[in-house]
Amino acid sequence: MTLRVGHVITSGVFSLDGEDFDVDNNIWLVGDDREVVVIDAAHDHRPIVEAVAGRRVLGVLCTHGHNDHINAAAELAEAVEAPIWLHPDDGMLWDVVYPDRRVDDSLRDGASIAVGGEDLTILHTPGHSPGGCCIHVPSLGLVFSGDTLFNGGPGATGRSFSSHDVLVGSIRSRLFVLPDETVVHTGHGDSTTIGREARNLDGLTDGVDRDPGSPDAAS
């Protein structure tokens, strides 16, 4: 069966460094008629369960550990009986939200997760957070970028555990090597393409740490 992509948007609050920001989050589902993975369970697990539509959930994949990308993960995992995956370098962020609940497995750079007969490849892209990851689906010509890359430039790096230089390096070395036509499904806002963002070099080298509460950046 051919893989297809599902999309849910939920709204809530991103909290870090003593500040709160209202945000809308993209939740992505990749699978076929029988099985699926969920990318970034944010804010409310109920619409995600509806989008799963009874399929077997192979995993709840967290692109990074900021609260607005994981705060529905535990409830979703319990509801659909699925494991939660997160890169270990974001464990300290996870522990803020879930001090008494561990993740079930680790996202590792270069690892593959099979769903619907196709492989999803994990790309470790630190910078927005130490354990930030993107998820590449070569067969569909797309990548799920979490908060690493947005329509218009890189993710915010003005918060704890983030680095603009590291983020730009990750984008250049891990994402801009993908084909230009690769579709980028982001953690917030509209999708884009690798080619479009690669041409926007000024946005990657201006050294400005964008605030996640601003219209052109997200948590």
PLM segments and residue spans:
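Active-site neighborhood of phospho(di)ester-bond hydrolases with catalytic His/Asp-centered motifs
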Residues: 39, 58-66, 84-88, 124-127, ...
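Residue-level detector of beta-strand structural context in well-folded domains
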Residues: 26-28, 105, 110-111, 133, ...
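Conserved beta-strand hairpin/beta-sheet module of binuclear metal-dependent hydrolase folds
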Residues: 2-55, 134-146
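Short, glycine/acidic-enriched loop or turn micro-motifs at the edges of active sites
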Residues: 43, 67, 90, 127, ...
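Metallo-beta-lactamase
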Residues: 36, 119, 130-219
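Active-site-proximal loop/helix segment associated with metal-binding centers of metalloenzymes
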Residues: 7-29, 95-98, 102, 153, ...
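Divalent metal-coordination and catalytic microenvironments
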Residues: 30, 40, 64, 76, ...
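Active-site HxH/HxHxD metal-binding segment of metal-dependent hydrolases
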Residues: 22-23, 36, 43-119, 199-207
